[in-house]
Curated annotation (Swiss-Prot):
PROSITE patterns: CHAPERONINS_CPN10. Heptamer of 7 subunits arranged in a ring. Interacts with the chaperonin GroEL. One of its GO terms (cellular component) is cytoplasm. This is Co-chaperonin GroES. Keywords: Chaperone, Cytoplasm. The keyword Cytoplasm applies. InterPro entries: Chaperonin_GroES, Chaperonin_GroES_sf, Chaprnonin_Cpn10_CS, GroES-like_sf. The gene is groES. HAMAP family: CH10 (MF_00580). It is found in: Cytoplasm. It comes from Xanthomonas campestris pv. campestris (strain ATCC 33913 / DSM 3586 / NCPPB 528 / LMG 568 / P 25).
């Protein structure tokens, strides 16, 4: 992947939901909810502040995160779907 996010943007590779429920039922694509979990694969330099400095990103590459269902923009590269989010759209870091 060759994408470098700007400023406080973060590129996340969504983690797909399970194909089979806990009870063993296969879940079709049409019934799956959009993923809201993913792994950070790239981060920008940080959020520009009013005084001209940058606030360093809190997340780092490799972090597993939870983000809002409708947050960010989708980007597809080499058949892989990514989300480009603002760091503020990330709700939590998992683990």
């Amino acid at each position: 992947m060759s994408i470098k996010p700007l400023h406080d943007r973060v590129v996340v590779k969504p983690i797909e939901a399970d194909e089979v429920s806990a009870g063993g039922i296969v879940i079709p694509d049409s019934a799956k909810e959009k993923s809201t979990k993913g792994e950070v694969v790239a981060i920008g330099a940080g959020k520009p502040l009013d005084n001209g400095s940058l606030r360093a990103p809190v997340v780092k590459v490799g972090d597993k995160v939870i983000y809002g269902q409708y947050a960010g923009s989708s980007y597809k590269s080499e058949g892989v779907e990514y989300k480009v989010l603002r760091e503020d759209d990330i709700l939590a870091v998992i683990g």
